[in-house]
Regions:
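Eukaryotic acidic, Ser/Thr-rich intrinsically disordered low-complexity regions
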Residues: 2-3, 114-145
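Helix-adjacent hinge/juxtasegments
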Residues: 48-87
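Residue-level signature of alpha-solenoid helical repeat scaffolds
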Residues: 23-24, 59-63, 97-98, 135-139
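Flexible loop/turn segments at the boundaries of HEAT repeats in alpha-solenoid HEAT proteins
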Residues: 27-37, 65-73, 102-113, 143-145
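N-terminal "cap/leader" segments of large eukaryotic alpha-helical scaffolds
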Residues: 1-24
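Short inter-helical turns and helix N-cap capping residues of alpha-solenoid HEAT/ARM repeat scaffolds
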Residues: 13-15, 49-51, 87-88, 125-126, ...
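Buried hydrophobic core positions in alpha-solenoid tandem helical repeats
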Residues: 5-7, 41-43, 73, 77-81, ...
Length: 145
């Protein structure tokens, strides 16, 4: 399947279908490097106005960590960073969770990830969400050490 068709299916108007397809790619990515060369294509969608789409592509990039080489993730990390400060706390939490893959398979990125997540401004989130994000940050920091 060509890259354009993959992207088209991942941004399908039917969010449920697009989400299921993204899950399938995530599962496949644990077994094969079939999608690793799509990291730049995935990164091009990180600024989409739809938070579901932005998050979906952030997670898919992280899913490629085990196969990435030649700084493939490092080269797009600046495009990924804004999602870690997204106004929607669920976006931030999902992205923090996805970064566990990167820390596991790309230990050379631990310092840049730690620096990035340590600067997340928790004060912009409701009192009910800020502690959960803080917990996610702490878990990721511990894994990165």
């Amino acid at each position: 399947m060509n890259n354009n068709l993959v992207i088209k299916k991942l941004i399908d108007k039917d969010d449920k279908q697009a989400y299921e397809y993204a899950k399938r790619i995530g599962i496949e990515s644990a077994k094969t490097n079939k999608y690793v060369d799509m990291i730049p294509d995935f990164a091009s969608m990180l600024q989409d106005k739809n938070s579901f789409i932005r998050t979906r592509f952030f997670i898919l990039i992280c899913d490629q960590a085990r196969w990435a080489s030649n700084n493939q993730i490092e080269n797009v990390f600046d495009q990924m960073k804004p999602l870690l400060n997204d106004p929607k706390p669920t976006v931030v939490r999902q992205c923090l969770n996805a970064l566990h893959e990167v820390i596991l398979f790309r230990p050379e990125m631990c310092d840049v990830i730690k620096n990035t997540i340590s600067s997340i401004d928790l004060s912009i989130y409701k009192d009910s969400m800020a502690p959960l994000i803080k917990k996610d940050i702490d878990e990721l920091m511990n894994r990165a050490d």
